[in-house]
Amino acid sequence: MALDSAKKQEIISKFAEHEGDTGSPAVQIALLSERISYLTEHLKEHKKDHSSRLGLLKLVGQRKRLLNYLKRKDYEKYTQVIKELGIRG
């Protein structure tokens, strides 16, 4: 399931670097993290939903690539994002 537009706008406004920013790595990582957490909860209830599991693995891989990119390009923003999202322990 996709995020509802209100939740999506809330995430975008929280992580956007400027007005109208929807594609920066920080925003993309935050949106992916929300979808990952939703799918994780879904899979706890529906253990045999293998297509959703594959989708989850794709999202995790995409988020990992974006995090590595952000780490290379803007380390301060990277540390801020992982702290706010509570990822990479």
UniProtKB/Swiss-Prot annotation:
A cellular component term, taken from the record's GO annotations:
cytosolic small ribosomal subunit
One Pfam match: Ribosomal_S15
**Top-level division of the source organism's lineage:** Bacteria
Q: What does this protein do?
A: One of the primary rRNA binding proteins, it binds directly to 16S rRNA where it helps nucleate assembly of the platform of the 30S subunit by binding and bridging several RNA helices of the 16S rRNA. Forms an intersubunit bridge (bridge B4) with the 23S rRNA of the 50S subunit in the ribosome.
The species is Nitratiruptor sp. (strain SB155-2)
One GO BP annotation here? Answer: translation
Annotated protein name in UniProt: Small ribosomal subunit protein uS15
Q: What is the lineage of its organism?
A: Bacteria, Pseudomonadati, Campylobacterota, Epsilonproteobacteria, Nautiliales
The family line of this record is: Belongs to the universal ribosomal protein uS15 family.
Cite the entry's keywords alphabetically. Ribonucleoprotein, Ribosomal protein, RNA-binding, rRNA-binding
Q: How does it assemble?
A: Part of the 30S ribosomal subunit. Forms a bridge to the 50S subunit in the 70S ribosome, contacting the 23S rRNA.
SMART domains according to UniProt: Ribosomal_S15 (SM01387)
